[in-house]
Design a protein with these regions (language model features):
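Phosphate-handling architecture centered on phosphoinositide signaling
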Residues: 1-175
Length: 175
């Protein structure tokens, strides 16, 4: 897909520490995907992996209303102040897990929010972690599905996707 899909913002959020906004980035790194040696490996890897897809209204991610009920969670959840970890910024979504060696075929309605603290700020981390939240408000109160295999835990209140920014400090290169 293009790095500037129609109808999506070209900038994410606003910086709190510096002026400006973070440039939006929707694509895989072209230096990797266009490399003749890496491209076939990437394509095969994508076919071999299970796919977790989540869907929500575009406005749930990118609305510019700075309001916990209607604001876009990808661009407005802001830094953690006190106990502010994005709980009021959960949006309805649908998640689907398909394919992979396990032959997954699962769909569930859920809540979607950004995961983390300062990693939610666009100037600190250009791509964010998400959290799928299973509450009766959005669908079933829990996800009961053997994501990790038959002999592993299979009941979840939430799943964190792309968790990073743990013991690191990742910033854009501002050169």
């Amino acid at each position: 897909p293009p790095n500037n899909p129609e109808g999506y913002p070209t900038e994410w959020g606003k910086f709190t520490d510096i002026q400006g906004k973070a440039p939006a980035d929707y694509e895989m790194d072209p230096e990797m995907t266009h490399d003749e040696e890496l491209r076939p490996k990437i394509m095969q890897g994508l076919r071999d992996l299970p796919i977790l897809s989540w869907v929500t209204d575009k406005e749930n991610l990118f609305s510019h209303e700075n309001d916990t009920a209607r604001g876009g969670i990808y661009i407005l959840t802001g830094p953690p102040v006190g106990d502010a970890t994005g709980h009021g910024w959960t949006r309805p979504a649908s998640a689907e897990l398909i394919g992979g060696p396990q032959g997954h075929d699962m769909q569930i309605d859920c809540g979607l929010r950004l995961h983390g603290g300062h990693g939610r700020l666009a100037e600190k981390n250009p791509k964010h972690s998400f959290r799928l939240v299973f509450k009766k408000e959005y669908g079933p109160g829990t996800l009961e599905y053997p994501i990790y295999g038959e002999n592993e835990p299979a009941k979840f209140n939430q799943l964190v996707l792309r968790c990073h920014f743990g013991n690191t400090w990742q910033h854009w290169g501002w050169a």
